[in-house]
Amino acid sequence: VIECPNSRNYVRLLTYIEGDFLKDVKPNSAMLFSVGEFLGNLDKALIGFEHKSSSREFIWDAAQIHVLISQLDHSKNDRSLIEYFIELYKDNVFGHINELSKGIIHNDGNDHNVIMDQNGKIKSIIDFGDMVFSLQALEPAVCMAYIAMNEEAPFELIASLLKGYSLTKALSEKDLESVVYLMCLRMCV
């Protein structure tokens, strides 16, 4: 904040990170493995971090299905599809949600927020505004959902990302089983 005689001005200083957004490069398995590793390392670094805003009602937290359900009236065209994925989540994940790993996650590793270097390695991630205390498996699921949405044959790519993440930040078998449902819910938000 810069105080002037007749005004108060807010200034934000940013560091420019050179590279290309993931959306602008053709992903391969090795590249997405490194993205998964990066996300896993980020989540490991966030262990023990606390913030009062991390536990809030938040539409972008796909694990908060009550928020998604409250918004169904705004999704008339896709309502039945969204309800289908909500039911899958309830049937396959919600019943054992207390067994799933939780922590503060970045929660927005989409292809517009991941910056790659010229060698196909992740350089950085931006946009920390969607951070939330949620299911750990949601971290790779968010990125995997955007990869799957933009690729004709995504399975090898998203498997590589999940492998990179889980080798860095271990996920339980139940966590791993929840990933596909969390991917689908993220696309419903």
Where are these regions (language model features)?
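Catalytic activation segment of kinase domains across protein kinase-like and atypical kinase folds
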Residues: 113-139
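ATP-binding pocket architecture of kinase catalytic cores
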Residues: 1-50
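Protein kinase-like catalytic core scaffold
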Residues: 12, 103, 121-124
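An alpha-helical support segment within catalytic cores of ATP-dependent transferases
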Residues: 48-51, 65-107, 117
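Short, conserved phosphate-binding/catalytic loop or strand-edge motifs used
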Residues: 56-67
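Active-site activation/catalytic loop segments of kinase-like enzymes and analogous catalytic loops
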Residues: 136-170, 184-189
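Generic structural signal for conserved hydrophobic packing positions in ordered secondary structure
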Residues: 12-14, 42, 105, 140, ...
